[in-house]
Amino acid sequence: MQSATMEFDTIAAISTPPGEGAISIVRLSGEQAVAIANKVYRSGTKDLAKVPTHTIHYGHIVDPQNDQLIDEVMLSVMRAPKTFTREDVVEINCHGGIVVVNQLLQLLLREGARMAEPGEFTKRAFLNGRMDLSQAEAVMDLIRAKTDKAMNVALNQLDGNLSTLIRSLRQEILNTLAQVEVNIDYPEYDDVEELTTKLLLEKAEFVKAQIQQLLTTAKQGKILREGLSTAIIGRPNVGKSSLLNHLLREEKAIVTDIAGTTRDVIEEYVNVRGVPLKLIDTAGIRETEDIVERIGVERSRKALADSDLILLVLNQSEELTEEDRQLLEATKGLKRVILLNKMDLPTKLDPNELQELVPAEEILSVSVLSNTGLDQLEAKIADLFFGGQTGEKDATYISNTRHIALLDQAALSLQEVINGIEAGMPVDLVQIDMTRCWDYLGEIVGDSVQDELITQLFSQFCLGK
């Protein structure tokens, strides 16, 4: 854990991705941010210590030890408290690349800044009260969002919608606990115990219902945040790789007429109507003597077991094979979409035989080669998991595994309250579980959380954020 001095010294980091580009940004935050920048900044007689806040300035970065020119820059000065970290912040826009930006960073470190740890700028925003813990976590969700729907969910959480709901539930519990304490301390009336247990029961049932309603969004929220693990399966050479390439809109998998050309599991993300699909193009699942191909087949079996959705591709220009039947049987009961590919060719597959094997499922006929029927596939995927609606902009979704676990614990605590009251337990014992629920909800927004957890959460962020 960092020392108090280390937590609030002046930090610096590169805030843009490494590599070539037009612009790179180096960020400073802390009490000495402006003073350190002033040591290396040159622009006539301009003194950064005297410029107004939230202004940008043209100039040069120069090594003060030897007057060597480092770069031509635009430098922003933003003074506390109206900054991302609520500290003095300086952002230096220099030319992109690796050498220039690293020389600039090393110069700032030499002049008194400390290299920021991953996520430390956002951690300071949290510690300084600019955002709560759930909002801070939404920053990383926003950075990692793979679709506009996932972005909307993250923005919603960053804007404080989840925080507002959690805090309102905590306030409901706090008000109830306060009333219970008053009733316990001043039992002037004969029916005070009955009134107290009634109050506890009503509030526990109300808050639990609110939490359970929130938890109903968890599955969709996690899909939007992490992606829907989708395995494309089928016997060799039915068009799995062609389907992957179509969905990706680019050539990622080898497409040939030779069975077994996909030797491994290929993973790619794709946006299907707002649903982030983690597409897994598997090697054909078949018996093989080829050692390398056999490894791919085993990985395919594992990918199949771990998938949220299966796209099972059959070739309708050929009769059903024993391998097709085995795949249909192996995926029975799982969320799947059955695709009859190569509809542009003469049909040899017996539809009656297939209907007997999957009597209650919709089967989509497509031609990946001619791009026919694939809009229906995308609509089917969105409908399977979101009823056609994905990540509405103003909706609050629970997508974070930590939040889901804490809400589950909070709901269990409230159930213990209800069970205790129904069993006739004393009020002072029942309210312990109510207090425990209040604590669990507090961990979501960071009101009651250990320093070690905070350090762990922010260590998952990228440098410079």
Swiss-Prot record:
(6S)-5-formyl-5,6,7,8-tetrahydrofolate binds at R27, E91, R130, K465. GO terms for biological process: tRNA methylation; tRNA wobble uridine modification. The keyword Ligase does not apply. This is tRNA modification GTPase MnmE. Homodimer. Heterotetramer of two MnmE and two MnmG subunits. Its main location: cytoplasm. The keyword Ribonucleoprotein does not apply. Belongs to the TRAFAC class TrmE-Era-EngA-EngB-Septin-like GTPase superfamily. TrmE GTPase family. One of its GO terms (molecular function) is metal ion binding. GO terms for cellular component: cytosol. Its EC number is 3.6.-.-. Binds 1 potassium ion per subunit. Gene3D superfamilies: P-loop containing nucleotide triphosphate hydrolases, Probable tRNA modification gtpase trme, domain 1, tRNA modification GTPase MnmE domain 2. Exhibits a very high intrinsic GTPase hydrolysis rate. Involved in the addition of a carboxymethylaminomethyl (cmnm) group at the wobble position (U34) of certain tRNAs, forming tRNA-cmnm(5)s(2)U34. InterPro entries: G_TrmE (IPR031168), GTP-bd (IPR006073), GTP-bd_TrmE_N (IPR018948), GTPase_MnmE (IPR004520), MnmE_dom2 (IPR027368), MnmE_helical (IPR025867), P-loop_NTPase (IPR027417), Small_GTP-bd (IPR005225). Keywords: Cytoplasm, GTP-binding, Hydrolase, Magnesium, Metal-binding, Nucleotide-binding, Potassium, tRNA processing. It is found in: Cytoplasm. It comes from Enterococcus faecalis (strain ATCC 700802 / V583). Residues 227-386 form the TrmE-type G domain. Pfam families: MMR_HSR1, MnmE_helical, TrmE_N. It is an enzyme of class 3 (hydrolase). Its cofactor is K(+). GTP binds at residues 237-242, 256-262, 281-284. The gene is mnmE. Mg(2+) binds at S241, T262. K(+) binds at N237, T256, I258, T261.
